[in-house]
Swiss-Prot record:
Record's protein name: WRKY transcription factor 72A
Gene3D superfamilies per UniProt: WRKY domain (2.20.25.80)
Anything else known: Plants silencing WRKY72A show a reduction of the R gene Mi-1-mediated resistance as well as basal defense against root-knot nematodes (RKNs) and potato aphids.
Annotated GO CC locations: nucleus
Function: Transcription activator involved in the transcriptional regulation of terpene biosynthesis in glandular trichomes. Binds to the promoter of the linalool synthase TPS5 and promotes TPS5 gene transactivation. In association with WRKY72B, contributes to basal defense against root-knot nematodes (RKNs) and potato aphids, as well as Mi-1-mediated gene-for-gene resistance to these pests. Both WRKY72A and WRKY72B are not required for gene-for-gene resistance mediated by Pto, another tomato R gene.
Length: 526
């Protein structure tokens, strides 16, 4: 209808331009409509694309989450399996640990029982102290000389010997394996070459000292344990050595435990000591030494080592000279001092005076014991220089001693004058060394000044006679025995407990030997 109107207007001569405008507007409207349609279609397509993209993204996001959940579940399953494996492994480890712990307790219990058994066994075995300063060559040479001399002395009825200390033994024969250095001291000579040549005095002295140091090695079946009783407030006595405590044990009847120490001066030193309080007097400390040092001793430890070694040597000299078995009917009496030897003034004194002290020994067929009691207070007595005696070559002095099997020997050493008292103080070793050395040197010098010094040739001849003539040695030993017997004749002797001898006067014997340098005179005093 609109077209018809336009056609009429055109036919009637209407304005043609208006029709054209209308047509143009209509065409523009149509184009706009088309544009709108296209744009709408585009929007719809775009929306569809957006929807598809968003759906795809949602799908991708959901897939990712699902994958993550699945991977997390897989990881959790793996962790759970690993936990199960770890639990099984931990159970196995705990089981092995319990088994090992049980085995450890069993081993520790066995070691404790073994240690207790060893301690009990060590208490029965008695070991003597030695210096451990001799070489193997000297020991071999010394053993050969002792064996050869023993074979020659078997022909004699009585085997009497002479050394720096006074000793003699019975005629009971013993096997060469039981030889002791005391069996041939002072009689060493070269019998293998068949000559009468004797050793020089200084070599004889060195041999005697080496023999005294090797008592345990030459006679392993005769061993001694040395106990020292001293008043001490500290847990242990300061004897100069280094010790490490390796155990303790409660003894029956004594509330104080017995501590066990080992010498740590050298890594392989076998020396041990036991420390315990006395049950009767808690202020008294009992220290028992056993073993042999296999290393050089420090200067602060030499005094105690030498003193205990001398006490053990004194006991061993008596036990080795008696019968070989417990059924022996006779036993020889043995008396020896603490071997006050001074070979050189520059060296420290090897042994010390023990004032207010007593030595008690319990003799056994295999395990003799000896105790140094430094706590007794004996009555004082003088020690005059004129008590040095000259012993003549005579056998007019009959021996005085008991032939009983002694199980206990007690030697109470009397003290010296009050102005010469030397109290034992193990905490201050240097002062004791100085006072003891000065005191003994003064006594030796005063004794030597009262005698007329013989020429060196005469002294050498006398020394040669003493070391080579057994009869002279026998006579001299008998004279020494008679003098010692007269000293102990005023004291009580118990037949059951053994020989109890108290020496109220020291018995010094002055032996002078020529030195290598002229004018140098050395005195060796017992």
């Amino acid at each position: 209808m609109h077209m018809e109107t336009v056609f009429r207007k055109s036919t009637h001569g209407g304005v043609v331009k208006q029709d054209i405008k209308i047509k143009a507007s209509e065409e523009g409207f149509v184009e706009d409509i088309n544009d709108l349609k296209v744009e709408k279609e585009r929007k719809s397509i775009h929306n569809e694309d957006d929807n598809s993209k968003s759906s795809q993204q949602k799908d991708l996001t959901g897939d990712k989450k699902d994958d993550q959940l699945e991977s997390a579940k897989a990881d959790m399953e793996e962790v759970m399996e690993e936990n199960q494996r770890l639990k099984k492994h931990l159970d196995k480890i705990m089981k092995d640990y319990r088994n090992l712990q049980m085995q450890f307790h069993e081993v520790a219990q066995r070691d404790a029982e073994k240690t207790n058994t060893d301690v009990k066994h060590d208490e029965a075995e008695l070991v003597s102290l030695s210096l451990g300063r001799t070489s193997s060559d000297t020991k071999k040479e010394l053993s050969k000389l002792i064996l050869s001399k023993k074979e020659n002395d078997e022909k004699e009825e009585d085997n009497l010997t002479l050394a720096l200390d006074c000793k003699f033994q019975s005629s009971t024969k013993s096997s060469p394996s039981n030889l002791s250095p005391e069996n041939s001291l002072g009689e060493v000579k070269d019998d293998e070459k068949g000559t009468d040549q004797t050793w020089p005095p200084h070599k004889v002295l060195k041999t005697i000292r080496n023999e005294e140091d090797d008592v345990t090695q030459q006679n392993p079946t005769k061993r001694a344990k040395v106990s020292v009783r001293v008043r001490c407030d500290t847990p242990t006595m300061n004897d100069g050595c280094q010790w490490r405590k390796y155990g303790q044990k409660i003894a029956k009847g004594n509330p104080c435990p017995r501590a066990y120490y080992r010498c740590t001066v050298a890594p392989n030193c076998p020396v041990r000591k036991q420390v315990q309080r006395c049950i009767q007097d808690m202020s008294i400390l009992i220290t028992t030494y056993e073993g042999t040092h296999n290393h050089p001793l420090p200067h602060s430890a030499t005094s105690m080592a030498f003193t205990t070694s001398a006490a053990a040597s004194m006991l061993l000299s008596g036990s080795s000279s008696s019968g070989s078995g417990p059924t022996s009917s006779t036993a020889s009496a043995t008396t020896s001092a603490l071997n006050y030897c001074f070979s050189d003034n520059s060296k420290p004194n090897p042994f010390y005076n023990l004032p207010h002290s007593s030595i008690s020994s319990s003799s056994h067929s295999q395990y003799p014991t000896i105790t140094l009691d430094l706590t007794s207070n004996s009555s004082t007595s003088s020690f005059p220089g004129q008590n040095y005696r000259t012993i003549a070559n005579s056998n007019n002095y009959p021996p005085r001693y008991n032939n009983n099997n002694s199980s206990t020997n007690i030697l109470n050493f009397s003290s010296f004058e009050s102005n010469h008292l030397l109290p034992m103080s193990w905490s201050n070793r240097n002062n004791q060394d100085t006072h003891s050395q000065s005191y003994l040197q003064n006594n030796i010098k005063s004794a030597a000044s009262t005698q007329t010094l013989l020429p060196q040739d005469t002294i050498a001849a006398a020394t040669k006679a003493i070391t080579s003539d057994p009869k002279f040695q026998s006579a001299l030993a008998v004279a020494l025995t008679s003098i010692i017997g007269s000293r102990s004749g005023n004291h009580h002797i118990d037949e059951k407990s053994g020989q109890n001898m108290k020496v109220t006067e020291p018995f010094p014997v002055l032996c002078s030997f020529p030195s290598t340098s002229p004018g140098d005179h050395k005195d060796y005093t017992l």
